[in-house]
């Protein structure tokens, strides 16, 4: 039996802190470093799993080259640093994180409370975490925008949602989640562009979206994560960190696989229903 989400988040936080338990330095610096390692490592893991998933659904090497761009300089971990951390804690934190993503609805803001707790802890309001949009407020803003868009349900073509100061994706995740409630065909219309000046926040936003795409198999039309100053660095000077455009072949094969799965479940239900009727008729 799995633990309640609150306890899983607590266990995840404790596991993250253990990543740098062997490091020297102050408590604050060790925790900040642990969070950075956790986010970058898990983003790398999830991106590898996304590419493997695309291959599973028929994407060729050429299609992957054309549809997936990753700037490794943002997520690479120094080998010297990697050799000095608690690898067991890192692996455990990755396992717990994936379990939390699986347990929550698709495109949930898993990292908000985690980052807020770590960055604001003992900071007396001086940490960057204070600027992350609270999930309740993000959902309210999204709902207000939703009401104003009368043609939302009639959309049949990809459309863009852009956030220039995205943080960990707090404002764009609810939009993706609302479309996901309708169905996979709706998230496949989302062209998300998220930007932040902080490279770690860009990694966090990318991790949140990619992990849901992998774990819940809800593909986006495109995800573009940009690391730049939105006021001074505009195209073509803005820097794309991650660009993922789901290949059409993958979208088609995912639909076929899920349709087949639903058909098999329906057949099993009919079979069980038939057996039940026979037993009842005999009695």
Describe each region flagged by the PLM:
Residues 1-119:
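A short N-terminal interaction module
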Residues 22, 56, 67, 112, ...:
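Histidine (H) residue identity feature
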Residues 26-34, 99-106, 126-133, 163, ...:
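Conserved aromatic-histidine-acidic binding/catalytic patches
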Residues 91-94, 141-144, 279:
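Generic low-complexity, intrinsically disordered sequence content enriched
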Residues 109-136, 143:
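Class I SAM-dependent transferase core
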Residues 134-235:
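Conserved S-adenosyl-L-methionine
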Residues 202, 208-283:
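S-adenosylmethionine
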């Amino acid at each position: 039996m799995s633990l309640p989400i609150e306890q899983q988040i607590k266990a995840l936080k404790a596991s993250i802190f253990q990543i740098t338990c062997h490091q020297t330095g102050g408590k604050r610096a060790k925790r900040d470093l642990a969070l950075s390692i956790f986010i970058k490592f898990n983003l790398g893991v999830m991106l590898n799993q996304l590419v493997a998933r695309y291959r599973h659904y028929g994407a060729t090497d050429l299609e992957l080259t054309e549809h997936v761009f990753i700037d490794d300089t943002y997520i690479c971990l120094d080998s010297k640093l990697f050799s000095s951390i608690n690898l067991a804690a890192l692996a455990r934190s990755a396992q717990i994180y994936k379990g939390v993503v699986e347990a929550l609805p698709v495109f949930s803001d898993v990292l908000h409370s985690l980052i807020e707790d770590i960055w604001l802890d003992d900071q007396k309001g001086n940490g960057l975490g204070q600027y992350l949009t609270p999930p309740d407020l993000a959902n309210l803003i999204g709902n207000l925008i939703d009401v104003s868009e009368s043609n939302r349900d009639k959309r049949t073509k990809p459309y863009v949602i852009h956030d220039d100061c995205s943080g960990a994706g707090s404002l764009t995740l609810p939009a993706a989640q609302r479309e996901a409630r309708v169905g996979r065909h709706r998230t496949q219309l989302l062209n998300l562009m998220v930007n932040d000046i902080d490279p770690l926040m860009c990694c966090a936003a990318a991790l949140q979206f990619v992990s849901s795409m992998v774990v819940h198999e809800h593909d986006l039309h495109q995800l573009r994560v940009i690391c730049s100053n939105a006021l001074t660095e505009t195209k073509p000077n803005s820097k794309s960190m991650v660009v993922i455009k789901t290949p059409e072949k993958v979208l088609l094969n995912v639909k076929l696989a899920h349709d087949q799965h639903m058909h098999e479940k329906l057949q099993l239900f009919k079979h069980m229903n038939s057996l039940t009727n026979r037993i009842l008729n005999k009695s």
